[in-house]
Amino acid sequence: MQKAGLLLRGWTRAWKSVRMASSGLTRQNPLANKVALVTASTDGIGLAIARRLAEDGAHVVISSRKQQNVDRAVATLQGEGLSVTGVVCHVGKAEDREKLVNMALKLHQGIDILVSNAAVNPFFGNLMDVTEEVWNKVLSINVTASAMMIKAVVPAMEKRGGGSVVIVSSVAGFVLFPSLGPYNVSKTALLGLTKNFAAELAPKNIRVNCLAPGLIKTHFSSVLWKEKAREEMIKETMQIRRLGKPEDCVGIVSFLCSEDASYINGETVVVGGGTPSRL
């Protein structure tokens, strides 16, 4: 009886290995043969995410507003042996969003993953001093463009039988960053966008989840840490011991895009080093 049980367990493990291999999936390559679009992915968190998705087996299309940045990032990642291409894309422009989607379809005949990472923050100061122009710019890029980007990829994902979207918000959506009012508001809006799209797209087998990074040391966040005194004040306020690195954010994104997260939808995961992060 014991011998039969051992044989059965061995057969089960072998069958699981065959099943994973037949689908092109392995624990080393959980995103094998998937096609991923990552916006704002030539630097910082976006670049780190693009690298990790490619390392995990995906074909990644990166994008940014400037051609030289796209060229540099593509050369770097291809030099690491990763399957990466790139295109200029200003997510606030409909024609650029269409160009990004069309490149993925032309090169890889489908789209499985979208990481919506693009954001702007043109203002630092008191909320009462924010102009209408600034409000429109922040909400247009940080919120509306994310919604339009998701809308653009859904038809392609449907043809593949489903897909996964990760919206990059921020811990600022829960706990305000000082003097970044419009940015904070836009990131809170993305939490709601995640919930609404998750519910609406679930019947299409498209999952929508959200990453909320804490204070990550990138060029984008440098206004909060480039002065040592300000960095220490921010760390104390956020109750963290150190600033995060872009690489701290990548594992959870790859997981959310994988089959291991097939029963996770509409959730926001905070990667914030312990920053209090609930509304």
Curated annotation (Swiss-Prot):
The record ties this protein, via Pfam families, to: adh_short_C2 (PF13561)
At what positions is Phosphoserine found? S221
What are the alphabetically sorted keywords of the record? Acetylation, NADP, Oxidoreductase, Peroxisome, Phosphoprotein
Please tell me where substrate binds in this chain. S170
Residues bearing N6-acetyllysine are K93, K106, K217
> EC number(s) on record?
1.1.1.184, 1.1.1.300
Positions of the record's site feature: Important for the maintenance of the quaternary structure, the catalytic activity and cold stability = N196
Protein name as it appears in the record: Dehydrogenase/reductase SDR family member 4
Q: Which reaction does it catalyse?
A: a secondary alcohol + NADP(+) = a ketone + NADPH + H(+); 3alpha-hydroxy-5beta-pregnan-20-one + NADP(+) = 5beta-pregnan-3,20-dione + NADPH + H(+); 5beta-dihydrotestosterone + NADPH + H(+) = 5beta-androstane-3alpha,17beta-diol + NADP(+); all-trans-retinol + NADP(+) = all-trans-retinal + NADPH + H(+)
